[in-house]
Swiss-Prot record:
Residues 44-84 form the ShKT domain. This is U-actitoxin-Avd8e. Keywords: Cleavage on pair of basic residues, Disulfide bond, Nematocyst, Secreted, Signal, Toxin. The lineage of its organism: Eukaryota, Metazoa, Cnidaria, Anthozoa, Hexacorallia. GO terms for cellular component: extracellular region; nematocyst. Residues 1-22 form the signal peptide. Residues 23-41 form a propeptide. It comes from Anemonia viridis. One of its GO terms (molecular function) is toxin activity.
Length: 84
């Protein structure tokens, strides 16, 4: 029963896609409305804030260029390092 429901939904979706692609004005209107929506910028967060960023990694580690800890800090603790 679930597969029949899925098949019906896919067929309805295909018919709607054919209708939209046949009417270029409608397609352009839909695309323009989608492009106008403001996408929120990705928030700057520290991935390992609860256990690593701030306790193991210090802001001084962000400036170390050749250490593994510095590379980890620059990649995963951007808020702590002030890169945001």
């Amino acid at each position: 029963m679930a597969s029949a429901r899925t098949l019906v939904l896919l067929l309805i979706g295909a018919v709607l896609m054919c209708q939209v692609s046949a009417d270029s004005e409608l397609l352009n209107e839909i695309l323009a409305a989608h492009m106008e929506e403001d996408m929120p910028e990705k928030r700057c967060i520290d991935r390992y804030r609860s256990n690593i960023c701030g306790s193991v990694i210090r802001p001084l580690d962000c400036t170390r260029r050749k250490s593994r800890m510095g590379r980890f800090a620059r990649t995963n603790c951007k808020k702590l390092c002030g890169f945001c």
